[in-house]
């Protein structure tokens, strides 16, 4: 039996669901991949970053509904403006004020296909404390969305209602400087950099 066949015979079950793969570029992720493989062998899912398909909102009512769902089931709230920091959940008045704050930056004549907001998710391995999820998500958001290049408004809601604690980040796509957010390969906002930031934080 060839070595590769022997290794596959032992590890095939563990890695059948893609545990051995990290999507995107592997630059700078060698240690992260080793950690991922060890956690995978022990039955843990790695940290995951993704933009929610169809998660952008186009109107104030859509945004208010999304915020109602995300921020009334949360255990920690982080607000880029600092006004709502420290809360576990938001009340109806908070959601209304936040919706109005986001909408002030929208251009009435501009109707982006993916919405005026972007909904992103950062999911963490089983056993990660909610406070750690909050702190990591906050650091990642500040690294990308509160920089000299641009200041974007966002709200983070941490959920601990599943095995894998996770942070929902709703981003107002128009920055204070007028830049419009999008995720793209070879763009300053790209999946690889977000994933790497989660590992580094």
Question: What annotation goes with each model-predicted range?
Answer:
Residues 1-201:
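N-terminal nicking endonuclease/strand-transfer module with a His-rich metal-binding environment
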């Amino acid at each position: 039996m060839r070595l590769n066949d022997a290794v596959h015979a032992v590890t095939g079950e563990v890695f059948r669901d893609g545990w051995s793969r990290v999507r995107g570029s592997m630059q700078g992720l060698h240690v992260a991949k080793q950690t991922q493989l060890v956690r995978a062998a022990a039955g843990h899912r790695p940290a995951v970053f993704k933009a929610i398909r169809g998660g952008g909102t186009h109107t104030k009512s859509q945004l208010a509904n999304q915020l109602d769902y995300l921020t009334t089931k949360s255990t920690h709230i982080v607000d880029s403006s600092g006004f709502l920091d420290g809360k576990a959940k938001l009340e109806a008045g908070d959601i209304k004020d936040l919706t109005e704050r986001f909408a002030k930056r929208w251009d009435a004549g501009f109707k982006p296909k993916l919405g005026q907001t972007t909904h992103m998710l950062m999911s963490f391995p089983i056993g990660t404390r909610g406070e750690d999820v909050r702190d990591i998500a906050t650091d990642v958001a500040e690294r990308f969305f509160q920089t000299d290049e641009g200041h974007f408004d966002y709200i983070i809601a941490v959920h601990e209602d599943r095995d894998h604690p996770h942070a929902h980040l709703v981003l107002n796509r128009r920055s204070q400087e007028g830049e419009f957010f999008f995720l793209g390969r070879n763009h300053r906002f790209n999946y690889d950099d977000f994933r790497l930031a989660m590992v580094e934080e």
